[in-house]
Amino acid sequence: MSTSSAPAAIGPYSQAVRVGDLLYTSGQVALDPATGQMISGGIEAQTVRVLENLKAVIEAAGTDLSNVVKTVVFLKNMGDFGAMNAVYGQYLAPNGVVAPARSTVEVARLPKDALVEIEVIARL
């Protein structure tokens, strides 16, 4: 599945794949959907863009962020964990909503030198 409301894939992969009643997204980095370029700004700005990209992908599949059951977060620097969490919580655990299961790992490098990449599994 694919939507123009999120950045086009930068490799041979799909934005998301449906398997039964689950949607598996590819990881999203902070690319502007209109230009395909990395946005400027720090971890907070990049996390917002990543989550907006993911929101566009899962909404195109007919679901929304409230149906996300699992995420994997890749950080270039674990020192950004707190700042990323502050933004992440606004999208995936607003107003005390139970947050999805999650793994977070630090990696040496991300595509386009992103600071954060997130992938999700959501119910349809």
Identify the residue ranges that each predicted region occupies:
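Short, polar/acidic, helix-capping and beta-turn segments at strand->helix junctions
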Residues: 1-124
